Every structure is written in C-alpha cells, then in structure tokens.
C-alpha cells in the first residue's frame, strides 16, 4: 500500500466571484486542511460548483486569491462531461488522467536525455518515476475499468465508443471512475453520488474513506455526508459567503441548531428591549402629565425647584426612551425562519387520521389500475393518515402512480378514488419558464409565507421565477403545499435540488403531517427512516406489504 499523502493546502482569501452583475461569492475566506474530507452544501445555485471550479483552477476569482497546493495532482469531477457527443470514451479517460499523461510525457522526455544526463538530471528523473509510481500510473486504465464495474456499469470499457451513445448516467459513471482511477492527491467531486445505486454509493463511500489525500465533495446526499465527511462548508445563497462546520455532518446539524437558537435569543432580546423602551416612555409620559405645569404666582423656594426638576427629569427620560426606541426600530433584529409545518385541517374537520364521519372519504382506493407500458396492474388501499413509500427501478411507473392519484392521468383500466384535497410535488419543474415574479404569480400573502419560512430572501420575491435556481423554485412548490390543507400528499423526489438543511426541515414537517402520504424518493436517509408501508413496483403485478 502506498503511503498516505498529507501535503494538500487550500486557502481562499477574500475571494469574490461574479457572473455578469450577479455576485455568487463575496469576500470568502476559508481553509481546507491536509487529509480532510469536506462536504460542500447549500441551496441550488448558491455557488457550490463555482467554488469547486475555483479550487480546480478552471475559473479565476474577480478579487482575492485562491491558493491550492497538491503535489500529488488534482482530480476534478464536474456534474457534466466537458466533451461533445462525438468524442470517444478514451477521450474522457484521457481527460481525467491528464496529470498522469503529462507525467508520462515528462518521463519519456527525461529518458531521451539519459545518455548525457548530469547527476541533477538523474535525480529529477528519479523524482518523476517516484511520482508516477505513487499515482499508480502503470495500471491506471485497468483501474478505470475495475472502478466502472464497482460503480454498477456492466458493459466492458470500449475506448472507441462514442460518448453520445452512452446514457446520461453512463457518462457520469465513466467520468467518476476515471477521476478516481487517476488517484490524485486532491479530489474535487461535484455530486459524485448522482446516477449511482445504493451498492455503488456504499462502495464509493468506502473508497473515499480510504483515500490517501484530501476530498472536497459537493453533495445533497445526507447519508454520504454523515458517513464520509469530517468537515462541512455551507455556501450561503443569501449572504454569498462560506461557513465552516467541524465534526462532519453531525457537527453541521449541531452548529445549525445552535445558530438558530442564538438567532431566537437575539430576536427575543430585541423584542424585550423594544417593549422596555415603550414601557419607559409611556410611564414617564404619565408622570410628566401629573406634574403641575404652572405654579402659583409668587411660589418659589425648594418646592418650586423640585417641581421644575421633576418636569425636566421626566422630559429627559421620555426623550431618552424615544431615542432608544427609534434606534431599536431603525435596526430591527430579523426573526429566525419559521419551521415548515403542514396545515392540519382535513376534509371532515378533524386534525388527523382515524375513524370518523369523514374517514371513508379520506381513504385511497386503487382498484386493478394499469397503464400499458407505464404501470403494471396494481391494487392498493390506504386508510386515512397512512404512509406509503413507493420504490422500484427507473421506468417502472413510480411517478405515473403519483400522477394517477393526483387525477392528472386516467388509467387504461381500473379505478382510483382519492380524498377531495390532494397535493402533488412533481419531479419536473413547472415554473422554469415563468417570466413573472413570485409576488405577481402567487400574491403578497403567499410571498410573505415563503419569506417567513426562510425559503427565499425578500429580494428574490420580486425576481422573475424563471431566474430563480431550480432549488429555489422547488422551495416555492413546497411552500405552496405547506400553505394548503391537504388530505393526501404526494411527493415525487422531494429532496431534489434542496440543501440538506431544508431536507431536514421537510423531514420534520412530514413527521407531524396528519394526512395520507405517498412518497417516492432516492434519498437513502429518508428511505431508511420511513415509518410506514412500502410498495416495490415491478414489471409484473405488485402488492403493498405491511
């Protein structure tokens, strides 16, 4: 086994990065220590991929400095391959092994000069060979093929195959396998668990835990963060800054909770100070009113002096209280975002599941339903308040089932009965072309709800919806569901495009949702903790298990 590498140095100093007029990162300073495994989290569009490209040297900051030292090489996995469909598989492998290919060329060049080499040339040649051996350069291509198999790719590696003939998942797995096979000291990975099944993700986690160098990975996968990372960097979309949390994902969750508690304390302290200032002003106004304004003619002496002193003192206290109140109201402490809570009113007027006059009308019945080519014959009954997790391979009909339950599709045979109030969170994005703002589309009351939950910054409420990131539009859809009383909630990949902190809130909100829930998700942590029934859809007739 080759010796561990612990020489990586990553330092960002006052880094600012903009695209056109939009500032993505603003005066960001942070450090990554040698050997750390860093998870980068944040809202979609917050600048996580930008941060990785800056570290990889693919982009330059507008201001500030990015210093990356990794003598053992840098491997950068982007979310998409930067090659045309006509490029070959071998081109993608060469791109990922570029450091090794460069080492090979330097070794060949040094070998061509060995017959007239000076002692220092021989030393340099030895260093090149040592670096090449440390990276396992001799069998890198074999490792690409072996890694591809561990990532779930069954087809043999054909270097002459066109990239355009691979699926999107196939291209992602190829890029990841080649990046890992290069064995660089520093791994920069952008959503490495995308397009991997559970077995492949488990292998990837073990591989990264055994990695000899430093890892910086952008990911939404909470279980991956929990198992792999030692440090979390959160890219704040609103503040355009980066905050560091130690002790892995557990430390991130603890730090977020502590930050929320601090914000609640500061907000309550500000409210108490406002109340105190108002009370002080009101009290002194009352005292001031009780002081005689005119003294009897000829009245003088100590009594007159005390009266004038009381008048002056009360006026001063009123003025001071009003000035303090003005300062407090001019610089208000914003309240912490309200947690997500689904509305708990149901069709029969109850606040949850169970028997009652409306229980039957709140149940779900799927009787021998089928859609040829999209969904195999299926029968299903859900009582009010039941929870169902729908699983199965891609293309088996999970989303189709949700659209049937939402009344957006008609079955070719059989029947579907659902409660009157049904909410569906779609996997696709219905708002990506909407030119109007959030306020214009949904109204001010809804916009206030979104802002109150901390789902969007106030400035984003007046931007065109299509200009928002996919994650921001996803949160719009979530807020729409939160605001409505629902009997049946249908969630199709609800964690897509959402930062882990928002997913944690969604998970807590679902735990208190009293209606019927049907969930489709690839989120391993959400699946593992799911408390209800499970239905695995198959190509053949399926039945729900208890």
Locations of regions flagged by a protein language model:
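ABC ATP-binding cassette signature C-motif
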Residues: 1-265, 345-546
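Proline-centered turn/helix-capping motifs that create local helix->coil transitions or kinks
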Residues: 117, 140, 289-294, 327-338
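Non-transmembrane amphipathic alpha-helical segments
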Residues: 100-111, 128, 270, 274-288, ...
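Interdomain "pre-motor" coupling segment immediately N-terminal to P-loop NTPase/helicase cores
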Residues: 314-329, 333
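Proline- and threonine-rich low-complexity intrinsically disordered cytosolic regions
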Residues: 296, 312, 323, 335, ...
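An accessory alpha-helical subdomain
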Residues: 131-134, 306-313, 317
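A short, surface-exposed helix-loop junction/capping segment
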Residues: 122-130, 298-308
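ABC ATPase nucleotide-binding domains
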Residues: 261-297, 311-319
């Amino acid at each position: 086994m080759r010796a561990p590498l612990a020489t990586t140095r990553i330092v960002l100093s006052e880094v600012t990065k903009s695209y056109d007029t939009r500032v993505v990162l603003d005066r960001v300073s942070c450090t990554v220590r040698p050997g750390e495994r860093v998870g980068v989290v944040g809202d979609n569009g917050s600048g996580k991929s930008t941060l990785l490209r800056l570290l990889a040297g693919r982009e330059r900051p507008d201001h500030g400095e990015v210093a990356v030292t990794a003598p053992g090489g840098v491997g950068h996995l982007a979310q998409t391959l930067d090659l045309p469909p006509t490029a070959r598989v071998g081109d993608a492998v060469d791109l990922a092994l570029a450091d090794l290919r460069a080492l090979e060329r330097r070794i060949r060049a040094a070998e061509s000069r060995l017959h007239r080499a000076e002692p220092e040339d021989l030393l340099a040649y030895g260093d090149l060979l040592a670096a090449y051996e440390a990276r396992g350069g001799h069998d890198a291509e074999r490792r690409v093929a072996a890694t591809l198999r561990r990532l779930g790719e069954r087809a043999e590696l054909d270097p002459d195959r066109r990239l355009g003939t691979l699926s999107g998942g196939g291209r992602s797995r190829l890029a990841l396998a080649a990046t890992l096979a290069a064995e660089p000291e520093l791994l920069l990975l952008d959503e490495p668990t995308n397009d991997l099944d559970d077995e492949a993700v488990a292998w990837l986690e073990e591989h990264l835990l055994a990695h000899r160098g430093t890892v910086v990975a952008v990911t939404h996968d909470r279980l991956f963060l929990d198992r792999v990372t030692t440090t979390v960097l959160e890219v704040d979309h609103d503040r355009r800054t980066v905050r560091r949390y130690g002790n892995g994902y557990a430390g991130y969750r603890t730090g977020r909770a502590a930050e929320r508690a601090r914000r609640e304390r500061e907000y309550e302290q500000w409210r108490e100070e406002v109340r105190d200032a108002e009370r002080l002003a009101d009290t002194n106004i009352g005292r001031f009113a009780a002081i005689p304004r005119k003294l009897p003619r000829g009245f003088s002496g100590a009594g007159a002096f005390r009266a004038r002193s009381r008048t002056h003192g009360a006026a001063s206290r009123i003025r001071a209280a009003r000035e303090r109140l003005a300062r407090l109201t001019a610089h208000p402490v914003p309240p912490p975002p309200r947690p997500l809570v689904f509305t708990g009113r149901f069709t029969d007027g109850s606040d949850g599941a169970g028997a009652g006059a409306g229980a039957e009308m709140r149940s779900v019945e799927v009787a021998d339903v089928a859609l040829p080519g999209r969904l195999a014959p299926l029968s299903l009954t859900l009582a009010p308040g039941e929870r169902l997790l729908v699983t199965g391979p891609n293309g088996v009909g999970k989303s189709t089932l949700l659209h049937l339950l939402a009344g957006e599709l008609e079955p070719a045979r059989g029947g579907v009965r659902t409660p009157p109030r049904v909410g569906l969170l779609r996997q696709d994005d219905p708002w990506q072309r909407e030119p109007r703002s959030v306020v214009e589309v949904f109204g001010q009351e809804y916009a206030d709800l979104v802002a109150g939950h901390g789902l969007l910054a106030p400035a984003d409420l007046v931007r065109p919806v299509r200009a928002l990131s996919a994650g921001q539009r996803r949160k719009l859809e979530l807020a729409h569901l939160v605001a409505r009383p629902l009997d049946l909630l249908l969630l199709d990949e609800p964690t897509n495009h959402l930062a882990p902190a928002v997913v944690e809130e969604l998970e807590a909100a679902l735990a208190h949702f009293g209606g019927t829930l049907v969930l489709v998700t690839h989120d391993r942590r959400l699946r593992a903790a799911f408390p209800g029934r499970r239905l695995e859809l198959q190509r053949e007739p399926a039945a729900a298990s208890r």
